[in-house]
Design a protein with these regions (language model features):
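Outer-membrane beta-barrel proteins
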Residues: 14, 59, 90-92, 139-141
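Surface beta-strand/loop "capping" patches
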Residues: 78-108
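Non-catalytic surface loops within mature trypsin-like serine protease
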Residues: 30, 46, 75-77, 90-92, ...
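Active-site-adjacent substrate/metal-binding segments within catalytic domains
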Residues: 1-8, 14-17, 74, 78-85, ...
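Extended acidic/polar, glycine-enriched regions
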Residues: 33-37, 105-172
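Accessory beta-strand-rich segments of carbohydrate-active enzymes
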Residues: 1-81, 109
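Well-ordered beta-strand positions enriched in small/hydrophobic/aromatic, beta-favoring residues
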Residues: 26, 40, 71, 149-151, ...
Length: 211
């Protein structure tokens, strides 16, 4: 829905408005009854307005209302890891392999350990005790070989994992280069939520099957 108001134990916890079908997160610590039962209420409103898409006009996507995705509760440490932003600085590429440095930005300012493993095999390929992680001869991600790695950031009381692919992507006029080689982008239009049995509440496994 276009707008959602969240209440915890009848206490207003926050609002998500004018942002369309995007995920959001709220801190509900002050409204929680620890050690007791809690009640979460989400009021979804799909009323159109001039202040947000589709601006009271025509549109070509499903306009279902309601709660269309999961609502989850996260228990976090006060100084826990909220996010991990990873930038790949590639120094060299040869024969489908790359060497360089992973530069990580996060909200925590405390000692940490970073581990990088092959996503399919679980084999550890590099690690560091800082947010700068040198790597050597990691497999490049490409359309034909979508190699992935799992980056794990760990502190004394929290852990966060992110999947990444090592690649370069740039445009040169009308040309698009992936890993230094020109590619031709092809695709098709698929609108999530268009299935008559599910609408915008289409299950993830069904979406994956369609893809």
């Amino acid at each position: 829905s276009y707008t959602a108001k969240v209440y915890v134990n009848d206490i207003f916890a926050g609002e998500h408005s004018r942002s369309g079908y995007t995920p959001f997160r709220l801190d509900i610590t002050s409204a929680v009854n620890f050690g007791a039962e809690n009640r979460i209420r989400v009021e979804a409103d799909n009323t159109k307005a001039d202040t947000m898409l589709p601006h009271n006009g025509d549109f070509d996507w499903a306009d279902d209302g309601g709660i269309t995705r999961r609502v989850t509760l996260e228990i976090r440490e006060p100084d826990g890891i909220e996010y991990m932003h990873i930038t790949e600085q590639i120094d060299s590429m040869q024969n489908g392999l790359a060497s360089g440095t992973l530069i990580i930005k996060t909200n925590v300012d405390k000692p940490c350990k970073v581990t990088v493993c092959d996503y399919m095999t679980g084999e550890k390929v590099c690690e560091s005790s800082s947010l700068t992680v040198p790597f050597k001869n990691l497999k490049l991600w490409s359309c034909c070989s979508p190699n992935l790695y799992l980056v794990t950031l760990k502190t004394d009381n929290d852990i966060l994992e992110e999947r990444i692919g090592i690649r370069t992507f740039e445009t040169k006029g009308e040309r698009v280069d992936l890993n230094g080689e020109e590619i031709y982008l092809k695709g098709c239009e698929w609108m999530p939520g268009s299935h008559p049995d599910f609408g915008m509440a289409e299950p993830l496994d069904h979406s994956i099957k369609c893809l």
